From Swiss-Prot:
GO terms for cellular component: extracellular region. This is Medusin-N1. One of its GO terms (biological process) is innate immune response. Signal peptide: none annotated. Keywords: Amidation, Amphibian defense peptide, Antimicrobial, Immunity, Innate immunity, Secreted.
């Protein structure tokens, strides 16, 4: 699960740019 945290953060940052 810990390995997916940075992935989720990067996805959220990508959505923020939209």
């Amino acid at each position: 699960l810990l390995g997916m945290l940075p992935v989720a953060l990067s996805a959220l940052s990508a959505l923020s740019k939209l």
